Amino acid sequence: MRSQDVLLATAVAVLVISAFCIVFYPRVQDFMVGNSLWNGLAGFSGEYKASCLDSATQLPRLPQGKVLLSIPYLSYTEEELTELKRFVTRGGRLILMDDYGQGNEVLEYLGLQMRFSGKPLLDPLFCYKNPRLPRITDFAPGVRKAGVKSVVFNHATILTNMGAGEVLAWSSDRSFLDLNGDEKWSPAEPKGPFPVAAKLKVGKGEFLLVSDPSILINSMIGKDNNRSFLEYLMGYNIEPGGLLVDRAHLEKTPLDESKLKLARAREIFSHPLPAMGLLALIFGGVARYLLWSKGGKID
């Protein structure tokens, strides 16, 4: 076998093996829909048949009956903020779940007073295993009517400046904001109860805020009434296939980016014309190579 043949075979093998590794190696990043480990959303997205968006500009033009769930760990563009506002004001339901305060840019853009504190919420008494897993037991009547008696948060924060927002859930009176990070209450640190979930009307739609996205992950969704609480937040008039998960504003590893690119390529070449074009390129390339390798003339 000639050296050119060896190089070509090696290159093809490397490409094929790389593609297989990207496809079959599991996702490990927090809140990724395809991540079936403890910190992923595979369970939630599979159970509720969620669709993923890679940009807020992909939001449907008719948002009634649709729910967008966003965890804002990356900033939004001006165009995306405009699309979010359009989605809500025209009848969509936006659920913003945040524990670090990045979601405040959405609140500011919408002209709302509410904010995510970004400071850790601890509860040494009403908690699951440790104070960083506060157990929420105080709910608005509508939430209690939906069968929600307790919800377990995981490294949460609180909501502030509620304004016209309707509070859906509060932490206990033993909870506090750990401003100095020592995990102990001091007189300078505010004590609860604090709002941790709220909703308000925005145009024809609804905007819901939850101060902890971790209730979605595989290891938390089954705790207490977390699943029932999420179902209440999503609403019961959601259309089939109407749950949308915004993955554009989640931090991604190089593996995640590669998986997304492969998925987009697979989507493109699943249509007849692009697939035929790709096959024509492959056959043409193989034919030229075979002709060249046999000493033929290629014009």
Kindly label every feature range from the protein language model:
Residues 1-299:
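Short, surface-exposed patches at the edges or C-terminal ends of soluble domains, predominantly
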